[in-house]
């Protein structure tokens, strides 16, 4: 019997996904352009109480679940319905399993009724997962058609720890083929769009998470980041997200492209509507002591002392920031430079020190990262692509090219040395800033990307995010504003510094980008999650979040 074509396998997956949504949760029709972010609330499918539940913060929900005000089954049902609506509007799910979620919720309610207490800090909280995390009994395809039809027989370590903490899993979200793209498109479900404008990208590779959380189809989402894949979707969807340093959270048991590539690590982290919810996630996971289950995790519990140190400087209005709005390689679009200026001026008016930062060898770092990502000649990703006969998506052709030569072992070792030397040199620059200003540098303010949420197929330059993957610095995304055609005009005297710079700037159209989310990243040193998140939360509060 002949094997099924890749088209048939993809069609079968889409049919199964469609069948997983009950008819009573379906729209009669959906728009193909414009904003859809408010449509779930206007659908008539969600009750007033379900709208209230899904609009609540994760922090609010766990408090009400812990004191018995809310039942897990009611919260889970509300988020299942909203996740189903989100997928119909922006195409953001790979696997949807409301029956498993509701069964898990009922078990949690029975536990609470018997023991009069929650099972853990995330008791009954619905969490959305990027399609890299394994959940026993569900399908993980990671956008490869050749992976379809296989059920997970166990949880990833992070999934297991979240389950132990009381989290409920309801959906796995879309990713781009290979993961190595800051947009989300694949041959299985097609393209995932931005809820605020269907003509714009949701980002990637955790783009399905960004879109799902923006639509409030999960209380918190989990993404991964090897070159901006948490931060870009958070920025493009006006959300908070953290790229923790390698070794802080468990990655064990998750799927990935280029497994065994250990020079630049992919890390896992949350995407949420507030810094408070990001903190809830981090504290809850670290409370489970993940270093006992994943040998790559550093035995480092949540450090309140670090958080308190940042809070003390906040109270004294003595924070010290560096900032830049141009990395010397690609000039950001006007909405992005305005976003950096809003943050700079807001902090300065509040009494803090904000001084310029000179980006150090960012072009070198980006080039090094690209060489590392393609060191195997793209053998790994094309093995999975070719196994089904599906074509490679056009978006990966520059980075993941099967015609690129493989690096030999000496070249890999040399790349690792170059990375380490660059990390040391960047630390030198950090100390030089402190010596020059006479102040401790608390964080750097920088763009996340050169553009606001970008038009489909137009994300070209990864450098603003990728450099901090090379450095392994902690980075938190803070939403700032939205592109405004009335003020974000093209620069009349703009002169490109490179072909890439010219191509990126040529993409800017004030009319097209009007209303697109704008964010910055707050960057701290390696393993500075507590301090950096506290500072990012404060920045958000100053901005009115």
UniProtKB/Swiss-Prot annotation:
Signal sequence residues: none
Domain of life: Eukaryota
Keywords, alphabetical: Hydrolase
GO molecular function: amidase activity
Catalyzed chemical reaction(s): a monocarboxylic acid amide + H2O = a monocarboxylate + NH4(+); acetamide + H2O = acetate + NH4(+)
E.C. number: 3.5.1.4
Pfam families (alphabetical): Amidase
InterPro entries from the UniProt entry: Amidase_CS, Amidase_dom, AS_sf
Active site positions: 130, 205, 229
PROSITE patterns the record matches: AMIDASES
Family, similarity comment: Belongs to the amidase family.
UniProt function note: Allows acetamide to be used as a sole carbon or nitrogen source.
Name of the molecule in the record: Acetamidase
Lineage: Eukaryota, Fungi, Dikarya, Ascomycota, Pezizomycotina
